[in-house]
Amino acid sequence: MDAAGRGCHLLPLPAARGPARAPAAAAAAAASPPGPCSGAACAPSAAAGAGAMNPSSSAGEEKGATGGSSSSGSGAGSCCLGAEGGADPRGAGSAAAAGAAALDEPAAAGQKEKDEALEEKLRNLTFRKQVSYRKAISRAGLQHLAPAHPLSLPVANGPAKEPRATLDWSENAVNGEHLWLETNVSGDLCYLGEENCQVRFAKSALRRKCAVCKIVVHTACIEQLEKINFRCKPTFREGGSRSPRENFVRHHWVHRRRQEGKCKQCGKGFQQKFSFHSKEIVAISCSWCKQAFHNKVTCFMLHHIEEPCSLGAHAAVIVPPTWIIKVKKPQNSLKASNRKKKRTSFKRKASKRGMEQENKGRPFVIKPISSPLMKPLLVFVNPKSGGNQGTKVLQMFMWYLNPRQVFDLSQEGPKDALELYRKVPNLRILACGGDGTVGWILSILDELQLSPQPPVGVLPLGTGNDLARTLNWGGGYTDEPVSKILCQVEDGTVVQLDRWNLHVERNPDLPPEELEDGVCKLPLNVFNNYFSLGFDAHVTLEFHESREANPEKFNSRFRNKMFYAGAAFSDFLQRSSRDLSKHVKVVCDGTDLTPKIQELKFQCIVFLNIPRYCAGTMPWGNPGDHHDFEPQRHDDGYIEVIGFTMASLAALQVGGHGERLHQCREVMLLTYKSIPMQVDGEPCRLAPAMIRISLRNQANMVQKSKRRTSMPLLNDPQSVPDRLRIRVNKISLQDYEGFHYDKEKLREASIPLGILVVRGDCDLETCRMYIDRLQEDLQSVSSGSQRVHYQDHETSFPRALSAQRLSPRWCFLDATSADRFYRIDRSQEHLHFVMEISQDEIFILDPDMVVSQPAGTPPGMPDLVVEQASGISDWWNPALRKRMLSDSGLGMIAPYYEDSDLKDLSHSRVLQSPVSSEDHAILQAVIAGDLMKLIESYKNGGSLLIQGPDHCSLLHYAAKTGNGEIVKYILDHGPSELLDMADSETGETALHKAACQRNRAVCQLLVDAGASLRKTDSKGKTPQERAQQAGDPDLAAYLESRQNYKVIGHEDLETAV
């Protein structure tokens, strides 16, 4: 098969040190060849692949497999080459002969030497037995798994090849070529390992990182990496092959010394001590689907090598390498050249010549396979937008997608890429840059006249981004995970955007000699956002002219903003635009607006297509009950005409709006002097002219949906929980910057702020208001004499309350991603639901927070609200408290207080064995299903935080027995930690137990109480999957419908490296 189908590449491991290293080495040998290979051809090389792990002990024993299979492969990537011989079959034979000689030599030695040889043989036999036992993994047998001996490597002739940093689209493109980027990472070891690293003793050697498969090597080791034939994941397939085309992609396995997430097979994490400098291979992951497995025989198995890759959570938007074909250059054979040529007509010659010109310089073609589930995505990134953001975004998209669907606009325009992909069905486009980048792509789409036109989404970089704000993409990219962005583009709604023509002619009312200095045409003849003239265009023009004259003075965004402010103030004092109304004539759909413009003396006139203008302001506002005007839309075929005075321009920044003049389909504008104008932010000074504005067409755009389409409908009473009980934790900027790639450490460093109970469909904008109210309650509580009551504790404790409030700059953090925490832009909070970023707790980042305690040792947080010391609060009654929360939709339970006397009371409670007779009575009552005995024992002082002989909680027992009344009593009176507490042996929660027993009533009680539907047991199974295994598809469907949102990571376990 071709290289696009098979990509299993693992790094060479160090030689095994004795028999104890054999299992790890054999486990790491799980790979398939990078070149043409079949399953049958891989099988004979089992021993060769395993023996390569320890050449010192198995070179002689494995000579048959190594030497015999060296000629069965073909091409540079053949899987059957010898471990020591490389591409030369003689190398394998030499190594085999040397090993055989090493076994025969002790025959002529003394008895002591014979004993040593016998002992050595026994060690070798032991290793061979282990290798044979692990044949399921080692049979893949990649030749590059073996550490190549420096003396056996061929010497390269000629100068060293420069590492490639960009994709090669020429006919010389090599499949599986790495894209090397300079990196300064110091924690990652060289991918070759200590045995093969060329500069392993140099601490400051230059390193490079592949943007596609994320491996890091020294610059001096790149040549060695090529010699062992370690390839990157394939991005295309070779054309001209007579073999049947495979419509699937195989995994591209890569060794990882550091790995986030959990193993796909066993569900356990990749935990290791001192992981930052670890030299051990802990995981094997696929750089396509991001699945990861432990480097163990029991986790990574043979069928993983041969099975097709699903391409992971983003398979619907990834362009498979099997679609992209490199066409071989046709060569005229001798037989064809001697054949008599037929005469062709001039028309046919011209047609053929035109086709050759069209295909000239295009060695690649796209042959897609149509599917209604596929929405292939093209990503265009402008690295110059947003400082250094564009470059980082470009690299992240190359990691998640096929690099040949990600394009750098600084290298080449979008035309060639759009032409290449023009026949791909359901195509979508993501423009990463400013509004100018979006306009550029839309203009090319107009030029190519694609039908149907692919919709365009926007990832805003830089400042401004009014179109991105209109389409709900926000005002700028913060650090939202690229995985979520891909989901949003895939699930986004396709809407239309009006686009308007600007037709410019010289003013016919003025003689040629009266035309003043100025350009005769606008910088753009089409606009998507706005077209304006007057004050705002004059300020923008001054900035552009000054930057062109002195570009070195405008290399700072802060300086640019200061210059804008200074230019605006200077223009305001000079009143250069005060006479604008005297030199223009505006006619909208036959209505002359000139008298009104002259009456109100506007200094700025804006023709607005979208609601946003000037970095997010809304100049049209909300007409409300004004019957003359309609609310503004970007797809209604009308353009809004707005006038501004200096006062209304100033009010615009604080929520004001301009003077609404008209909503029309056509505008005729005449100017009688040179006036500054701007088209979508591109300024000029236009000579007196007649400008006609008319509707051009409508472009398809991707609007970011407020929720994923895969989420349950909000109006479905069975799909969204009535309320969510969520703990709020705050994190300092210092901890966030230090631990944002280590979720566990960051969780430990967070400080609990309090607990909210909100509606199930609450969004973050509303949740922000509740958190601010929580702060107010905290301050009011701190002013009085209070006592804090802890659940399951009869005593109350006086407390000194924390007076540190949240700063106004705090923001939400998304903790649902597999690799790290991400900040959420405040302007996009209304687009996110609480349950989209929360797994029973919310994290917020406070940049002004002062850390008052060491990270990782947060004290306990009370579960109940603070009550007055003089009496008992109604909140102490669990049933009444539950009813109050459900009625209000919001409850504040227990703000967090700091006290050194209570740091031993952890909010993460630990179960204890029964110590009193009441505890034993409670345990027996729950197991027997005796509710009355349970109530009596609990009133007599028994604890609900006890465990049975098998380390299960009371809620586990109640869920297993299926007694709904006991489950309800424990939920009402027990601590909240019991709800999602996992069994120490199986990792199952109470919901897992109930699902295994197919007890629907208990499952409903637990789900209504807020039990997590996404927690997995030790085998990686959710309660829904347990119900499916138990043979209750109705219960499984119910649990699936009640899930808060679709989990991206558990199916494919996206893992960061």
From Swiss-Prot:
Positions of the DAGKc domain:
372-507
Q: What is this protein called?
A: Diacylglycerol kinase iota
Highest taxon of source? Eukaryota
What EC identifiers does the entry list? 2.7.1.107
Record's subcellular location: Cell projection, Axon; Cell projection, Dendrite; Presynapse; Postsynapse
Q: Which Gene3D superfamilies match?
A: 2.60.200.40, 3.30.60.20, Ankyrin repeat-containing domain (1.25.40.20), Probable inorganic polyphosphate/atp-NAD kinase, domain 1 (3.40.50.10330)
Q: Keywords in UniProt for this one?
A: ANK repeat, ATP-binding, Cell membrane, Cell projection, Cytoplasm, Cytoplasmic vesicle, Kinase, Lipid metabolism, Membrane, Nucleotide-binding, Nucleus, Repeat, Synapse, Transferase
What is the predominant subcellular site recorded for this chain?
other
In chain numbering, motif PDZ-binding lies across: 1055-1057
> Tissue range of expression?
Specifically expressed in brain and retina. In brain, highly expressed in hippocampus, caudate nucleus, occipital pole, cerebral cortex, and cerebellum. Also detected in kidney.
Biased composition (Low complexity) is annotated at 15-59
Which SUPFAM superfamilies does this chain map to?
Answer: Ankyrin repeat, NAD kinase/diacylglycerol kinase-like
The molecular function terms in GO held by this entry are: ATP binding; ATP-dependent diacylglycerol kinase activity
Q: How does it assemble?
A: Interacts (via PDZ-binding motif) with DLG4; controls the localization of DGKI to the synapse. Interacts (via PDZ-binding motif) with DLG1. Interacts (via PDZ-binding motif) with DLG2. Interacts (via PDZ-binding motif) with DLG3. May interact with RASGRP3; involved in the regulation of RASGRP3 activity.
**Quick one: which pathway?**
Lipid metabolism; glycerolipid metabolism
Species for this entry: Homo sapiens
A GO BP term, please? diacylglycerol metabolic process
> Sorted alphabetically, which PANTHER family does this protein's record hold?
DIACYLGLYCEROL KINASE, DIACYLGLYCEROL KINASE IOTA
**Biological role:** Diacylglycerol kinase that converts diacylglycerol/DAG into phosphatidic acid/phosphatidate/PA and regulates the respective levels of these two bioactive lipids. Thereby, acts as a central switch between the signaling pathways activated by these second messengers with different cellular targets and opposite effects in numerous biological processes. Has probably no preference for any of the diacylglycerols in terms of the acyl chain composition, especially for the acyl chain at the sn-2 position.
Task: Name the top EC class.
Answer: transferase
ANK repeats by residue range? 950-979, 986-1015
Region annotation Disordered: where it falls in the sequence: 15-74, 334-358, 1014-1033
What residue spans carry the Basic residues bias annotation? Answer: 337-352
